[in-house]
Amino acid sequence: MTNYIFVTGGVVSSLGKGIAAASLAAILEARGLNVTMLKLDPYINVDPGTMSPIQHGEVFVTDDGAETDLDLGHYERFIRTRMTKRNNFTTGRVYEEVIKRERRGDYLGATIQVIPHITNEIKRRIIAGAEGVDVAIVEIGGTVGDIESQPFLEAIRQLGTEVGRDHAMYMHLTLVPYIAVSGEVKTKPTQHSVKELRSIGIQPDILVCRSENALPSNERSKIALFTNVADKAVISLKDANSIYKIPAALKAQGMDELVVQRFGLECPEADLTEWEQVLYAESNPVGEVTIGMVGKYVELPDAYKSVNEALKHAGLKNRLTVNIRYVDSQDIESKGEQILHGLDAILVPGGFGERGIEGKIAAAKYAREQKVPYLGICLGMQVAIIEFARNVAGMESANSSEFDPQTPYPVVGLITEWLDADGSTAQRSEASDLGGTMRLGSQLCHLIPGSKVHDLYGSAEIYERHRHRYEVNNNLRDKLEASGLKVTGLSTDKRLVEVIELGDHPWFVAGQFHPEFNSTPRDGHPLFEGFVKAAGEYYKNNN
């Protein structure tokens, strides 16, 4: 039977529930347990696919094509279980399903209510997502007290009762602020947060207290007394300069043992050797590089969370500290390419819309002409192709039909049909809805032997995740290749261009897919490793 750990948050948002939950999952996995994680988001959007990255951060894409919360990226970076569509759902998704069933007549004329119909659907989805594992860690988005979270909290209260105390635990994460003027930590916000949680019938079994510094034992005992939580179950989680230190910090306080004892699980001690190796590499770099991230959502780094992490992972593999300099592509348009001076490499990540596009094209041009290592991801590949078409292939005014429908050279256009990795044919048009209609999920890519990417991956066939509507226009592909563009990766049916390279450049690679979603701190990713290595070589040669 699956054991459940329900994770809630209190006092303020953005405390790191996802990191704390994923760190606990990493320890349990290191004890040989089969672990999965779920994220329940209270917002009414069906999924985050059409939400602004400035408001919500990155959209993380799973192998099976789900557009999900960025916390699922944390989950995959901390544990080896692959997330799927079942691991993330929203209020909007729940209501959509319940209303669909009501219209179909499944409820036999009943009056549809939050309790029991909405809460039952939430429970059904939790159970389905947790099927077949030893432990399922279920994170509830938002904070206790939010009106949007109430159906989810009621659902996990009911589910905890139904599976029984031996198979359910509640973990609550709160803030314990430090008041510098008085030199004291304040436990009252945590006490009130737990009081709020208990008022709806949930008694936390573990309290994780976020604070600037480690909590003194007397303060932990005080919190335990007023929240009815055992002393040993009040966990102090101080600020850390690396999220990959959190598993060891939680293990040192015996959090995993609390879980194992509660569920009566027999398993060996956690072996955190892999995480120790990650921390050693992070703490002992032999050099550093500065990589320019050219985008239009740079005011919120979480909009590029997986790319940021993938660069750090590649730095670990190369024993280099990767400093990321965020460059607003609109600043390149207004101030010129001098903004890019001093960079050891340039990365243009995915994105949508016309704003700032000419700045990204200028960044690709600068990288090509100055022989600066370049990695283009999704839109980053498309702007590289537009730049090459305009300035090398003689196609003046070349563009994507997304940005200029009247361009005489639409080198990038809407994909109207493609073959998915499972062999099914997908079709789209300009009239298709924005949400959930892109080429999504893991797709097979054929790499050309002898190419840089083939050498990096060490394989002729790879699987990478996609999230896009536009692709290279095959009608103009021959002209691009005749001018020196190398197409080194093709789709399942070998019709869509997936990877390009420049043969006369030390390191210029761009892919239509999102390799960042497959990068982890323990394993890295070959494309990012090669990119950061090239940045290190560029630094050596120019300093």
UniProtKB/Swiss-Prot annotation:
Pathway(s) per entry: Pyrimidine metabolism; CTP biosynthesis via de novo pathway; CTP from UDP: step 2/2
Gene Ontology terms for molecular function: ATP binding; CTP synthase activity; glutaminase activity; identical protein binding; metal ion binding
UniProt keyword ATP-binding, yes or no: yes
Start and end residues of each stretch annotated as Amidoligase domain: 1-265
Keywords per UniProt: ATP-binding, Glutamine amidotransferase, Ligase, Magnesium, Metal-binding, Nucleotide-binding, Pyrimidine biosynthesis
Class of the enzyme per the UniProt entry, highest EC level: ligase
Highest rank taxon of the organism: Bacteria
One GO process term, biological-process aspect: 'de novo' CTP biosynthetic process
Residues that bind CTP: S13, D146, I147, E148, K186, T187, K188, P189, T190, Q191, K222
Every Glutamine amidotransferase type-1 domain range: 290-541
Positions bound to ATP: S14, L15, G16, K17, G18, I19, D71, K238, D239, A240
Residues annotated as binding Mg(2+): D71, E139
Active site, UniProt feature: C378 (nucleophile), H514, E516
Catalytic activity: UTP + L-glutamine + ATP + H2O = CTP + L-glutamate + ADP + phosphate + 2 H(+); L-glutamine + H2O = L-glutamate + NH4(+); UTP + NH4(+) + ATP = CTP + ADP + phosphate + 2 H(+)
Keyword Metal-binding included in the entry's annotation: yes
Subunit structure of this chain's protein: Homotetramer.
Alphabetized NCBIfam families for the sequence: PRK05380.1, PyrG
Family: Belongs to the CTP synthase family.
Miscellaneous section: CTPSs have evolved a hybrid strategy for distinguishing between UTP and CTP. The overlapping regions of the product feedback inhibitory and substrate sites recognize a common feature in both compounds, the triphosphate moiety. To differentiate isosteric substrate and product pyrimidine rings, an additional pocket far from the expected kinase/ligase catalytic site, specifically recognizes the cytosine and ribose portions of the product inhibitor.
Name of protein: CTP synthase
The species this protein was found in: Pseudoalteromonas atlantica (strain T6c / ATCC BAA-1087)
